[in-house]
């Protein structure tokens, strides 16, 4: 039996453990977590075989160690690994959102016959903790794997083979490229979304409508600002240099936009909006990227009693689950008065088919 050790067993670690436990008969899973209540819960729902409060014994018995901990905590673990009597050719991977800080230890560990393959599963949920773990959490999500040394090629292949059951889409890249791309598509957008929310909050006293009307499109485009602030504080610190470089580019672009508006140039304004529209319309629709995704269907319903229950009853009859449902009070540029959110694009498509008697729309 191959021995797999999880260090950290929250939503991500728990979901990976759940998937491996379900699909692999040739492994045993042990978990170590400072929060022992997470271990008790994981054991009770059957996603691990053993729980451990003895880190030293656990790492020394493991064939593969998966660190599902914050990046700075993972770094401390990596620095300390050569002090233990680990198995020959032990493989290490992680689930951190930044990779450069982790991968700088690849050669250091390789000198001790410890094989590091950095990992970043680009999936998550607004819920946390092992009780919210799902074995299918990573389906169709991008899963980044990083290694620089050819001596880690075999470890890379073994980790990818082990994780194939997640049905994730694996991408191999460098730590530098990973941190640059996630900075553009995830980290900086989170900062901008939070900034927009702060801007809204600063003007609430000017008019109560600022908050009231934010219930529509503004709330949608700033949804990511509701993410875990501790996690995003740490990500921002870890990817500081890349984030600052991108933010300065964005600042310059905003200066250009201000200049266009000040000079009342309609052609340049049109180009600004149209170029963005054309590029965005070309972005993939069915792939889960760096930002968490909700698959929304907009349904046009009349303002009559029983219409919402009619929609949900139809979906229930077709065994289609929904993750959220909301009446849109402010829906400028959005078709439909009811927004129904689904867990995946297939459920959304099935929902649209089931609700064919209604006018529906999704992006």
From Swiss-Prot:
Domain ACT: start-end pairs: 296-363
GO annotation terms (biological process): tyrosine biosynthetic process
Cross-referenced CDD domains: ACT_PDH-BS
Enzyme Commission code(s) on record: 1.3.1.12
Keywords: Amino-acid biosynthesis, Aromatic amino acid biosynthesis, NAD, Oxidoreductase, Tyrosine biosynthesis
Species of the source: Staphylococcus saprophyticus subsp. saprophyticus (strain ATCC 15305 / DSM 20229 / NCIMB 8711 / NCTC 7292 / S-41)
Broadest EC class assigned to this enzyme: oxidoreductase
Known pathway: Amino-acid biosynthesis; L-tyrosine biosynthesis; (4-hydroxyphenyl)pyruvate from prephenate (NAD(+) route): step 1/1
Matches recorded under PANTHER family: PREPHENATE DEHYDROGENASE, PREPHENATE DEHYDROGENASE [NADP(+)]
Family recorded in the similarity comment: Belongs to the prephenate/arogenate dehydrogenase family.
GO molecular function: NAD+ binding; prephenate dehydrogenase (NAD+) activity; prephenate dehydrogenase (NADP+) activity
Reactions accelerated catalytically: prephenate + NAD(+) = 3-(4-hydroxyphenyl)pyruvate + CO2 + NADH
Positions of NAD(+) binding: 3-33
Pfam family, one: PDH_C
Spans through the membrane: none
Domain named Prephenate/arogenate dehydrogenase: residues: 2-291
Name of the protein: Prephenate dehydrogenase
